[in-house]
Design a protein with these regions (language model features):
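Basic- and aromatic-enriched surface patches that contact anionic nucleotides/nucleic acids
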Residues: 1-112, 116, 166-167, 342, ...
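Short amphipathic alpha-helical segments and their helix-coil junctions
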Residues: 18-33, 38-42, 79-83, 146-167, ...
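Short, hydrophobic/amphipathic alpha-helical patches that form generic packing surfaces
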Residues: 42-46, 98-107, 174-185, 200-205, ...
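Structured, charged N-terminal subsegments at the starts of enzyme catalytic cores
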Residues: 108-186
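Intrinsically disordered, low-complexity N-proximal targeting/linker segments that flank membranes
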Residues: 207-295, 303
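Short beta-strand-alpha-helix junction that forms the catalytic/metal-binding core
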Residues: 293, 305-331
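Polybasic, low-complexity binding patches
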Residues: 313, 331-359
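C-terminal, well-folded lobe of enzymatic/effector domains
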Residues: 351-430
Length: 430
């Protein structure tokens, strides 16, 4: 029997629901086979308002999968080896690895073009920008991945020699890219002491000149051939060394690990002979990890507050150095004239030996033992500037009165950088 009520209900459902679905227009972006990979990546980023971003590694993984090659599986194994064996590489990212490969692949193509008569202007450029990474093929990965992995291992060993042991203390993760590529390209030529000195100068110019923040792919592309040529004696100073500059007043604003130059200067002090307060030995990897060496105040925070010294001044890198956790506990909040005898007793050394250790940290013993903060501050600032000059080979213009009591500019004292919550503060002793 016909049920008019049910028929009406179905007609209404068809009109109000089904027909609306038929008329609904779904936005579609058509990507043809000839659409460049970088365009696909850009489209995804623009329309994907949620979820995981499609980075260059993800897109290349999909591209390689079309050729039955599992890029992610290969990378995961390499990543595990690199990060398990080298703590300084634990912040390394998959696109860092791809950038290093891209630099080497494009450099090889440029050299091949130049060798067959192309001019410098017409030969393809060296690049590690996204569009160039997306042009990599499975054959490129297979040809270079092992060598680039070895290059990052050599980069890690180079950093250990510079007293940079952990990823947390790495001034610029990005600088790993050209560094690893250089070691790959140089091969055995990069193993000599002379080569390492030249590479180290380039490295410290980049760190202390603070040149590797922001968009730096173009700098990578210049660094690789220019530093390799410098090592091989075929060219003058790389542009990175030429552009590096350190202003003396920058010491006053280096207060936390937010600054690459802060972490770099801390490592530089250890590299150039900073000795452990307790053992008197150079701070090597084992000492660094076993004794939990970290950056601590020389004149303790509690003492500085009592002396009415502003936080922007006592938190500067000028008043900090690498100390073992045990030594820092002995220091507490006491004046240097009080804590130094305790440190000497714990270390089993006399005042003269302790003075030698203090000098290895660019600390003037007489000023520190006399609790003369401003005399210590000015003397240490000058010593630090000399260390920076030695590492970069660049002369720093001095402002002699900048580090004196009552002269430190308010602009430097006020608004200190955000405190690094991971950096331990002194535990005041009663």
């Amino acid at each position: 029997k016909h049920d008019a009520t049910k028929s009406d209900l179905f007609d209404r459902f068809e009109a109000e629901v089904i027909d609306r679905f038929k008329q609904y227009q779904v936005p579609v972006i058509e990507l043809k086979k000839e659409t460049p990979k970088e365009a696909v990546c850009l489209v995804f980023e623009r329309v994907n308002t949620g979820g995981v971003a499609l980075n260059v590694f993800e897109l290349l993984t999909a591209s390689f999968a079309a050729e039955d090659y599992q890029l992610r599986d290969d990378w995961n194994l390499r990543e595990q080896r690199l990060k398990d064996q080298h703590p300084v590489l634990r912040s390394l990212q998959n696109d860092d690895f791809l950038q290093a490969i891209s630099l080497l692949v494009t450099q090889m193509r440029r050299r091949e073009a130049l060798s067959t008569g192309a001019t410098a202007d017409s030969a393809p450029g060296i690049s590690c920008k996204r569009k160039d990474i997306l042009k990599l093929e499975v054959a490129d990965w297979k040809a270079w991945a092992d060598r680039v992995e070895a290059g990052f291992v050599r980069a890690a060993r180079f950093l250990y020699a510079q007293k940079i042991f952990k990823a947390r203390d790495l001034p610029y993760r990005t600088q790993l890219v050209p560094l690893a590529a250089m070691f790959v390209d140089l091969g055995k030529d990069g193993e000599t002491e002379g080569a390492r000195q030249k590479i180290a100068r380039w490295y410290w110019c980049g760190v202390l000149g603070e040149l590797y923040g922001g968009a730096i792919e173009s700098r990578f592309a210049r660094d690789l051939p220019e530093v390799v040529a410098l090592v091989q004696g075929d060219a003058g100073e790389p542009i990175t060394i030429q552009e590096s500059s350190f202003q003396s007043g920058r010491l006053l604003t280096l207060r936390t690990r937010n600054s690459a130059a802060y972490k770099g200067l801390y490592a530089l002090l250890m590299r150039d002979g900073g000795r452990d307060f307790r053992t008197g030995e150079p701070i090597e990897a084992q000492t660094f990890f076993d004794d939990k060496v970290d950056i601590h105040h020389i004149f303790p925070e509690k003492w500085c507050k009592t002396a009415e010294i502003k936080a922007g001044t006592y938190n500067s890198v000028i008043n900090k150095t690498a100390l073992a956790a045990r030594t820092n506990r002995q220091i507490g909040g006491r004046a240097p004239s009080k804590y130094l005898p305790a440190v000497e007793k714990a270390a089993g050394v006399g005042a003269e030996r302790m003075n030698e250790i203090l000098r290895s940290h660019c600390i003037a013993p007489t000023e520190l033992r006399g609790d003369r903060f401003w005399e210590f501050y000015a003397a240490r600032a000058e010593e630090l500037l000399q260390r920076i000059e030695g590492a970069t080979g660049k002369t720093i213009t001095r402002e002699p009165e900048m580090f004196r009591a009552g002269v430190v500019a308010e602009a430097y004292d006020e608004g200190p950088e955000e405190w690094d919550a991971e950096e331990p503060l002194e535990q005041a002793l009663s």
